[in-house]
Amino acid sequence: LEEIRALGREVDDPKVPMIFNKQSTSACGPFDEIHDPKVSNKLDYEGELAFIIGKKCRHVPREEAKNVILGYCVSNDVSVRDWQMRVPTFTIGKSFDTHCPFGPSIVTSDEISDPHNLDIKTEVNGEVRQDSNTKNLIFDCFQLVEHLSTSFTLEPGDLILTGTPGGVGIADNNFLKKGDNVKISISELG
């Protein structure tokens, strides 16, 4: 909720997740350079837990959701904030090329003790900006699978990001600058 409030939006306890797509060209490796958007100086980071769907599925109840998740990885939901806020949906501001680094590895579901109790930390140039735990997610991974699979078929390889803790740059106008080093770590994942 902290991140949503930092965007200047009033929220109560959300009843359904806010969902948006990212273009496939936003995906890149964890050590690839994040391209400067050139049309904005409001480039922001969002350290997030991501998970990968392992089985084609539809209408998956929460209790069975863990059975369709192949594994988990670290991700950065890079956002161009002014473009994100121009329209009601976030897709355009979150889909610039290279704005979804993830990896470097996928840790299979059976190797994770509890995906909803992992420490997550984001550092920019060595300064800790986000420090939280996935137990603070508004919607957990299994709720997201249930919600999304109610609307459409999930395919093997689909990458789903779970949301970010407080501490994003927009909260205090501390945006990324060219050459900044962003490091995101999640316990049990790297």
What do these predicted regions represent?
Residues F51, G157, I186:
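Conserved S/T- and glycine-rich ATP-binding loop of Class I adenylate-forming
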Residues N125, T162-G163, S187:
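Generic beta-strand/beta-sheet core signal
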Residues P101, G166-G190:
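Charged, cofactor-coupling segments
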Residues D140-L176:
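A conserved acidic, glycine/proline-rich C-terminal tail/linker
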Residues L1-V128, S132, N181:
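Active-site microenvironments in enzyme catalytic cores
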